[in-house]
Amino acid sequence: MNRRTVVLSLGSIVAAWPSCSHAQSLPRHAPQGLTWKDIPKICILSAEDDFRVPAIREAVEFWNAEPSQLGSAFRLGTTAHSLRTISADDLHAYRATPRIVAPSLLNSVREANGDVIIALSDGDGFNPFTSPWPAVRKVLVAIPSFRKYSLPSPGLARNVVAHELGYAVGLGHNDVATSLMCGGAWCHFEFPSAGFFALTTAEKAKLLEMYPPHWQPVPSRRWKADPPAGTAG
């Protein structure tokens, strides 16, 4: 398949701290330095035949290969596929106003059987985003339909999902236009027909800082963003 030049603003991490099943006001900023204490399980929410599902599995393999090559034991966990979906309206509204969470969106994330919830939306009115939700110990990754691109290539979906999973692992933006974690409107990507954009040397060092060679998963699901035991989430 030929490479396609696509201009896409990938830089869109938003935060939410939902703690009840009613629409609510939320802090604006995501927790910094998100680090998993265990192996996070992946749950895909989409139709059964969604063309983006293989791209997710490839992106998970990418993020498991990177720590392995660096000598870290950290991995993303098993991937499950649920035919439940999150409405495009809920995702669009949350992306536009992340301080407000609709009950239906909160319940969908809370009930999903996984730690990293990847919602493959049939809507295209928002950019991809990743949102840590410490109160329910989950991370929401929302991916739009890509219908606005006449011939979306597998390289587009694969790299967009991998970019968002980079946030879920704990990385942030950089300004290197040809790297995977470049964020913002200045990133003009020619998506490769095979494989992924690379991580920078600094990002590889950051991964080893977060998940060093002696890193081992612990039984309880706790991450740095969690409140201390015995306090409200």
Question: What positions do the PLM features span?
Answer:
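N-terminal export leaders
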Residues: R3-V7
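Disordered inhibitory propeptide/activation segment of secreted metzincin zinc metalloprotease zymogens
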Residues: L8-G11, W17-V53, E58-S68, A112, ...
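Residues at structural and domain junctions
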Residues: I42, D49, L151, P192-S193
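Soluble periplasmic/extracytoplasmic beta-strand elements of cell-envelope proteins
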Residues: C43, I117-A119, L180-C182
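Metzincin-family zinc-dependent endopeptidase catalytic domain
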Residues: D50-A168, G172-D175
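Metalloprotease/metallohydrolase-associated module, dominated by Zn2+-dependent proteases
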Residues: V139-Y149, G155-L156, G172-G233
